[in-house]
C-alpha cells in the first residue's frame, strides 16, 4: 500500500491473523504524509524472511519461495508527484536504485506502488521493458520511471497485458473526469514469464481515489 500517512516504522499483527509492516517519516512530531507498507496474509507472514523500512517512500520485504535457492523481493514505493521538486525525485530514485543494487540477480524482484508516472501507450525506445497496452501519453515522471526500468531491466506489467481501459486506469479524479494509469507492478525481465496478469480490481471498499492493482 502507498500513501498510508503513518509515521515511524513497525510491524503489527491484526486480530484476524494478518500482519502489517510499514515505513513512514521517523522524525519527532513527524507530519502524517507519504508512508508505505504491506498487508501480509498468514501464509505470506510465514514466508517473510526480513524487511527493511528504507524511507517514508520505500519499503522492502523478502520472502521464501518454493524454490529453495530463489527468494522473492518486493519493493513497495510511493514516488513524488509529477510537479514535485527535482530534488525530491532525484532523492527517491537514488534510494530506489540503491535498493535495486542490493537485490541478488537470482532472486525475483517485484517493484510496485504509486509512481505518479504515466508511461503511456507508445513504447518506442522502451520495447524491452514496456508493452503497448499503457494508457494515454507519457509524462515527465513516466519518462523518469521508464528510464529507471530500462536501466534495471524490469518490465512494467500493466503495459504488457491487454485489458479494457477501465481495468487499466488506477486513479480517478474526485469529479470522475480524469483517469490515469499511475500505479504499476514491475518484475525483473528474466522472470517476466512468471507474471501472469496485471489488472485493476474495481469496487474495493478502500476509501481511496486509487483502485486496487
Each language-model region and where it sits:
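A shared catalytic/ligand-binding motif for oxyanion handling
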Residues: 1-213
Amino acid at each position: 500500500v502507498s500513501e498510508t500517512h503513518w509515521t515511524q516504522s513497525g510491524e503489527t499483527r491484526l486480530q484476524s491473523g494478518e500482519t502489517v509492516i510499514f515505513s513512514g517519516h521517523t522524525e519527532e512530531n513527524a507530519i502524517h504524509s507519504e508512508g508505505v507498507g504491506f498487508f501480509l496474509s498468514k501464509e505470506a507472514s510465514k514466508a517473510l524472511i526480513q524487511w527493511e523500512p528504507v524511507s517514508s517512500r520505500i519499503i522492502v520485504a523478502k520472502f521464501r519461495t518454493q524454490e529453495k535457492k530463489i527468494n522473492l523481493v518486493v519493493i513497495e514505493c510511493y514516488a513524488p508527484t509529477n510537479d514535485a521538486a527535482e530534488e525530491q525525485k532525484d532523492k527517491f530514485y537514488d534510494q530506489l536504485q540503491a535498493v535495486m543494487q542490493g537485490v541478488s540477480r537470482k532472486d525475483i524482484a517485484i517493484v510496485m506502488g504509486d509512481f505518479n508516472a504515466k508511461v503511456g501507450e507508445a513504447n518506442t525506445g522502451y520495447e524491452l521493458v514496456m508493452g503497448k497496452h499503457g494508457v494515454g501519453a507519457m509524462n515527465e515522471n513516466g519518462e523518469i520511471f521508464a528510464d529507471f526500468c530500462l536501466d534495471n531491466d524490469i518490465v512494467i506489467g500493466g503495459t504488457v497485458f491487454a485489458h479494457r481501459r477501465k481495468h487499466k486506469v488506477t486513479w480517478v479524479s474526485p469529479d470522475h473526469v480524469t483517469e490515469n494509469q499511475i500505479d504499476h507492478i514491475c518484475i525483473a525481465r528474466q522472470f517476466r514469464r512468471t507474471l501472469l496478469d496485471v489488472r485493476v480490481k474495481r469496487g474495493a471498499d478502500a476509501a481511496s481515489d486509487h483502485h486496487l492493482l
